[in-house]
């Protein structure tokens, strides 16, 4: 769709104008069976945002391997809407084409956060990670890893093509729903 392409071009231009190149990032994430892969995203945070995590640790409002801060100072000014509407995730369709990800599945976590996994969490590595999933349509802004894990296991245990289609169809509703937006 031309409008989507134009919209992505506008996101790219705004990001480059506000914080320079590159307009996308590659992050090491954990995929199927613990395979490390490079996940692509539009860059909405400052260049050294991952390194700043340690200095902002006391502000972290999440548990386990999650890291979320309300009004995160690492986000580039005026790009909050890109994150709010998950536009930064669109480059992950390249990961789907490469076979590293699926459209639906558990969200891939950073490779350097796996030390926070206990044995039961490893079960989420038995499926391809996804761009969207049960978490994203039910409680996408939760800061509790146990909630993430609960939805991941529910997805794994109930997987079907029909289930994936339902999740895909509900994703836009979840993204634009006021009741789900938050942290």
Kindly label every feature range from the protein language model:
Residues 66, 78-81, 153:
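Conserved short-loop catalytic and cofactor-binding motifs
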Residues 17, 22, 90-183:
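Hydrophobic structural segments characteristic of membrane proteins
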Residues 6-51, 161-183:
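A hydrophobic, helix-centered structural microdomain
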């Amino acid at each position: 769709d031309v409008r989507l392409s134009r919209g992505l071009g506008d996101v790219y231009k705004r990001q480059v104008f506000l914080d320079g190149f590159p307009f996308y990032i590659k992050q090491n994430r954990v995929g199927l069976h613990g395979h490390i892969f490079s996940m692509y995203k539009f860059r909405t945070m400052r260049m050294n945002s991952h390194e700043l995590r340690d200095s902002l640790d006391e502000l972290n409002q999440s548990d386990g391997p999650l890291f979320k801060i309300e009004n995160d100072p690492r986000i580039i000014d005026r790009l909050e809407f890109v994150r709010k509407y998950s536009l930064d995730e669109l480059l992950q369709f390249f990961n789907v084409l490469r076979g590293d990800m699926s459209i639906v599945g558990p969200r891939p976590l950073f490779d350097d956060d796996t030390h926070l996994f206990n044995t039961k969490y490893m079960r989420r590595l038995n499926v391809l990670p996804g761009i969207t999933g049960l978490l994203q349509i039910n409680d996408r802004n939760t800061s509790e890893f146990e909630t993430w894990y609960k939805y991941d296991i529910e997805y794994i245990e109930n997987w079907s093509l029909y289930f994936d289609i339902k999740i895909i169809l509900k994703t836009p509703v979840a993204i634009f729903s006021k009741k789900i937006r938050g942290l």
